[in-house]
Amino acid sequence: GGRMRDATSIQTLADCLHFMQVGEIERAIALFPEDVREHFPKELRKIHLFHIEKNGLSINQIVALANALTGEHLSATTIQNWTKREVRKIIGVPRIGKKYSLHQAAIIYLLDDLKHLFSLEETSSLLALIFNNPDRDEDDFIKPIDFYRLYAEYAKSTSPIDLLDTRAKRSLEKTKYTHPNIIHVLKLCLYAHRVTTLELEAKQYLNRFI
């Protein structure tokens, strides 16, 4: 599978989903690299018309969005498989026609980041600690996009993960989210992110000598 997203890419994706969610589509579009904006991939040509009440994203659009924003290689086949496997319990069914909501897209991006360290079963159980029933948003301990933004904020940090509790609690106090599971899941996501980052660095270093 493709490279893990670096902290900057995670932040860009988080911002894009957030702007789309609050209806600031121009700000979302401004995040794409200039060459992409000049020639949007066909899946994203209508992105400027995106309306949160009316539009969802297909799996191909979820993939195209991440790849165009971050130069990643997320695969539609992988996600298609997830929607048939155990992990579909956490993604939920397509909500808007045959398409997924932006919150569901955030869950898919999280799954992609976590799959490097945890099995799909572990990942499902882990995300179920904060996202209860994927087909309803109101029972989540935190909205998926807001959690993805929190994760983006901390993915940049290099402090020891077990020392992040106090800081993360302060970040959360500024929001309406208070459930202790949020911090536990955040830390597990950060472990996954760091393990993969270290693995990548190690391999790049090795390749200089062999």
Residue ranges and their predicted role:
Residues 5-129:
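Basic helix-turn-helix/winged-helix DNA-binding cores
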Residues 1-3:
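Short, Lys/Arg-enriched N-terminal segments with co-localized hydrophobic residues
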Residues 123-210:
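Intrinsically disordered, low-complexity, charge-dense segments enriched in Lys/Arg
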